[in-house]
Amino acid sequence: MKFIVKLFPEIMIKSETVRKRFAKILTSNIRNILQKYDEETAVVRHWDYIEVRSKNEENREELIALLQRIPGIHHFLEVEEKPFTDLHHIFELTLADVAQQLQGKTFCVRVKRKGKHKFSSIEAERYIGGGLNQHIESTKVRLKNPDVTVRIDIEDDKMMLVKARHAGIGGYPIGTQEDVLSLISGGFDSGVSSYMLIRRGSRVHYCFFNLGGAAHEIGVKQMAYHIWQRYSASHKVRFIAINFEGVVGEILEKVDNGQMGVVLKRMMVRAASKVAQRFNIEAIVTGEALGQVSSQTLTNLRLIDEAADALVLRPLITHDKEQIIAMAKEIGTDDIAKSMPEFCGVISKNPTIKAVREKILAEEGNFNFEILESAVQNAKYLDIRQIAEETEKEVVEVEAISVLGENEVILDIRSPEETDEKPFESGAHDVIQMPFYKLSSQFGSLDQSKNYVLYCERGVMSKLQALYLKENGFSNVRVFAKNIH
């Protein structure tokens, strides 16, 4: 099993030194991710592509899914490599492979060639295409918009028949740009803005300001972990949780109602700047879009930025909400975001749309900044990979089992894509599929006389959700221990 990985076009047009550096980083990223799932995977860098090989055909679907989510990959080809002796031999090998596929269909042949040969790429296309047309009675050549395009790459004495072409997410490899700190709330905007910086080549760390208690923090951890695991698992990142309840309380007590929204955002960027400075991070990322809510006017955004000691990046600044939600669906964070309450907007009933600097500074003069300092000093710093370990400690009261009892039902909380790809086999026991992001709204509608055993592939989400359900009064939950690490 072999894949030919093609780099993002913007990488290919850079200087040779930069292109080599980017390709080297991408090769390392691919290796870091794929070898976690298949230790025998080989990743080799060439001048204009990266070669991925694996002997384990059973891992094909998983390797394809992983490659499709690695930043820096424009597309990749699934190929079958064979040695050849001459052009007629290439035709014979191609005929044996595609004859069945071309029955009753129109086709064309496209050849890319490297090395010295007695034929050109066009001559190869004509010879192979003509031969296929003669030997397969029910097929017909069509050069424009054919049913099937037979793609062949020829390099020296080997031919690669392209079995499939898979799109990547493009962008730059993680690590080619500097680190950023994303202010993640669990909503649509912050998840998408985090993804956009990952796709642009930055390692994204996460800073969460907790305004809503343990359940809110669990939900945000789920989103951060989901984004990291799907798109940036090649790198270690930090998850920082700052308890902002005291800061919000001080604002509610000391700040004029209309100025609360801007003041709260200024406190957040102050705190985030301190965290960024601690880890030598140059920029913080927010999900704000111009005019989307009252605090997101140019005047207010400028005043918010004045409180920051780090560069503030807003990748969604010109995006419509509809576009943002569509992107959230693409990256798989939309359902998590739907379950997240928006806390920032509820503390001010009549927010100002054009804050005045002097008035903001006067209101902040009433604020006790020791509360902000204390919140930052008491922040919790976590390697995002340790979310599973931390959750295991928190869910000590949730029983983990590997053998199912009579009254127990497996609750498969993986995404629909994962369950379709790899269904859970339970034997005689019932299996209910309910993605983790729907548990908060749908678990209560299940038959509560049953005991539900939560299952996910890695064991992380099942433990997070078990904690959430326990905190909400459901005692009939357990965790399936098969994949707990």
Swiss-Prot record:
SMART domains: THUMP. It comes from Haemophilus influenzae (strain PittGG). It is an enzyme of class 2 (transferase). Keywords: ATP-binding, Cytoplasm, Disulfide bond, Nucleotide-binding, Redox-active center, RNA-binding, Thiamine biosynthesis, Transferase, tRNA-binding. GO terms for biological process: thiamine biosynthetic process; thiamine diphosphate biosynthetic process; thiazole biosynthetic process; tRNA 4-thiouridine biosynthesis. This is tRNA sulfurtransferase. Pfam families: Rhodanese (PF00581), ThiI (PF02568), ThiI_fer (PF22025), THUMP (PF02926). The active site is at C456. Residues 61-165 form the THUMP domain. Catalyzes the ATP-dependent transfer of a sulfur to tRNA to produce 4-thiouridine in position 8 of tRNAs, which functions as a near-UV photosensor. Also catalyzes the transfer of sulfur to the sulfur carrier protein ThiS, forming ThiS-thiocarboxylate. This is a step in the synthesis of thiazole, in the thiamine biosynthesis pathway. The sulfur is donated as persulfide by IscS.
